[in-house]
From Swiss-Prot:
Function: Contributes to the nuclear transport of the viral transcriptional activator VP16 homolog during the early phase of infection. Therefore, participates indirectly in the regulation of the immediate-early gene expression. Additionally, seems to be important for efficient nuclear targeting of capsids.
GO cellular component, one term: viral tegument
The species this protein was found in: Varicella-zoster virus (strain Oka vaccine) (HHV-3)
Pfam families tied to this protein: Herpes_UL14 (PF03580)
UniProt KW Coiled coil keyword: no
InterPro entries assigned to the protein according to its UniProt record, in alphabetical order: Herpes_UL14 (IPR005207)
Membrane-spanning parts: none
UniProt-annotated stretches for the region Disordered: 176-199
Post-translational modification note: Phosphorylated.
Keywords noted in UniProt: Host cytoplasm, Host nucleus, Virion, Virion tegument
Chief localization: virion
Family to which the UniProt record says this protein belongs: Belongs to the alphaherpesvirinae HHV-1 UL14 protein family.
Protein name: Tegument protein UL14 homolog
Compositional bias (Polar residues): 176-191
Length: 199
């Protein structure tokens, strides 16, 4: 027993009929044109038969095409309705699951809670007052900047061997005079500097 639905079988039959009508119309039209190209008269019985059959086949093909278009249109409408039904069913399930959120008592209670919270926040701000030090405090304000500057001025730099070597290799200031950047000759009586090593 086939597992195809009746709708599938109907679609298959319609497709087969449409293909057959298309092929039949094409064959009769081609036969008609061949007779004309071969010099047949329009009074020729062969031409009359071929031309009449071609007209009937073309009419049948047009009917099949219109029928297929109407069927497709109806099926599309059905799919649209089914999609709408599924959409509304899903929405209904969600609303039923969360029914308490749309109840009038819940909405009134939520509004009252929001109003109470606003009133309590206002009372809290009134209790704090406008002269509290941290009223307008923001992240890294002037006090934070002053504290960081104090730390930078009072904290000694690290004295690790690595940083000491960096101090020997990297100048602390950049010379403004380009002549200062030229290598200076070593005097004959001056010994070269002894490399500094840690013991």
């Amino acid at each position: 027993m086939s597992g195809h639905t009746p709708t599938y079988a109907s679609h298959r039959r319609n497709r087969v009929k449409l293909v057959e009508a298309h092929n039949r119309a094409g064959l009769f039209k081609e036969r008609t044109l061949d007779l004309i190209r071969g010099g047949a008269s329009v009074q020729d019985p062969a031409f009359v038969y071929a031309f009449t059959a071609a007209k009937e086949a073309c009419a049948d093909l047009n009917n099949q095409l219109r029928s297929a278009a109407r069927i497709a249109s109806v099926e599309q409408k059905i799919r649209d309705i089914q999609s709408k039904v599924e959409e509304q069913t899903s929405i209904q399930q969600i609303l039923n699951t969360n029914r308490r959120y749309i109840a009038p008592d819940f909405i009134r209670g939520l509004d009252k809670t929001e109003d109470d919270n606003t009133d309590n926040i206002d009372r809290l701000e009134d209790a704090v007052g406008p002269n509290i030090e941290h009223e307008n405090h923001t992240w890294f304000g002037e006090d934070d900047e002053a504290l960081l500057t104090q730390w930078m001025l009072t904290t000694h730099p690290p004295t690790s061997k690595y940083l000491q070597l960096q101090d020997l290799c990297v100048p602390t200031t950049i010379p403004t005079d380009m002549n200062q950047m030229q290598p200076q000759p070593i005097s004959k009586n001056e010994n070269p500097p002894t490399p500094h090593t840690d013991v």
